[in-house]
């Protein structure tokens, strides 16, 4: 969601702040701004819309100074317009904020009663006035921030810059991530290591309740009880590889085409293709002692979790609940301490997923996580971490992170099956071999891009689309619908094909495309029956199947996308590609912002 950067250094800071903000664009935003100090005086520039608008503003109205803070805003309180953009300033300070101040209305009412005037609709401005009030009592900036933090309720990451003090930045974290970066004679604050990559690869992550005082020469970190603490210093990895789209039009397209390579890396981390066995040293969980698995996630990660539910139940004979994190955390479900709680997140900072993890941890469950960012909060609070190794994913609509999540959990399902005695060594080798073939099949599917792009000419002209699938193709149908509405803004729904007669069939007419995901597996004939029901009502079918399925369908389709014939186990990995390409090329034809679709954020760090 919102992105934060702070720099205290020796070089002109404005271009460095903008460079860092560009690296935070992937998080999603609707406005941006920076503030600097020059000769002790605060000044700022803000702009609605993309960073290019801020750059134009700065070209005409430069901001000098070697210390500053910057922000990309994803609106929560107040419209996405310039006067609500960060940084927010008073006569004494500038502040940027990621998160939600839940008691801002109460704080605002108190401050307005004291005669303080608010200029924006945001919750952040209440923080600015609250700290300013303490400064006006004669407190130092450190004392003022320290004394205000206990009065803030909600989730927040904050960075402060103070009028008249070019030697000080203060940051605070309660929920959304905030990292401290270490340089030579300069220091940094950032929402993640990606933002700090141009300047340093040496970072510490603040923990919940921490606040940090930065000078050019170092940092002092305090916990929620105001006691000095040290946080581990670590080297960040692979944060510079995101800056180029290469020969691709969008990051999303680039990331789709990276999938054969990154999936190979993921699988090789968990599987030994020479012996055909799971790498036991990579697992870190004794599945023989697990009697139930709960997998919790949000968005695309939830659909990956739902695919994995089928795998764990069918292959490992392990009962599984897959839950949406924002619902799970409030269900107050009974949990057995012999259960394993697994959490899936690209960023490792998803607010609802993290809250669900903490709920399970409080119940005494062992915690596992499947993550792309291994230095994240969820990783640090897990007993076992299973990295997806997808590399930075910049497009808001997930592609390679999704298939790498599937790859990791498919490997874990084999490990669980072997540990529980549900499969023998021969079957383990068969399944490992099938997964080893997935990158080759995915490469073949990528060669169908031009054919799929042609299908999208008709798809881009409709207002509603229905996706259908059975078995593991059902969560793929939901993921396909999510992809299409995320980036093309076409309304789409994903349903289990067997549910067609229980409501969705009422929507079918000659204007309604129905995308059917149907490999020629044991469920294919049932899905054909559903396609016949659609065809009988004039619905236009886009069938995604293999050669055998295409030849036996005997139904007129709007288009048929023929994929390689693959084993049922790996079909979700292979069939994920065409639904990504359908969404991508439809969005391109419609002229939307594919990498940064409206109203969406890459990392959802507030509830």
Curated annotation (Swiss-Prot):
Catalytic activity: D-fructose 6-phosphate + L-glutamine = D-glucosamine 6-phosphate + L-glutamate
Keyword Transport: no
Record GO biological process: carbohydrate metabolic process; fructose 6-phosphate metabolic process; protein N-linked glycosylation; UDP-N-acetylglucosamine metabolic process
Domain called Glutamine amidotransferase type-2: residue spans: 2-217
One MF term in the entry's GO annotations: carbohydrate derivative binding
GO cellular component: cytosol
Enzyme class: transferase
SUPFAM superfamilies in the cross-refs: N-terminal nucleophile aminohydrolases (Ntn hydrolases), SIS domain
PROSITE patterns (alphabetical): GATASE_TYPE_2, SIS
Active site feature: 2 (nucleophile), 602 (for fru-6p isomerization activity)
Domain of life: Bacteria
InterPro entries the UniProt entry points to: GATase_2_dom, GFAT, GFAT_N, GlmS/AgaS_SIS, GlmS/FrlB_SIS, Ntn_hydrolases_N, SIS_dom, SIS_dom_sf
Protein name from the UniProt record: Glutamine--fructose-6-phosphate aminotransferase [isomerizing]
The organism of origin for this protein: Brucella melitensis biotype 1 (strain ATCC 23456 / CCUG 17765 / NCTC 10094 / 16M)
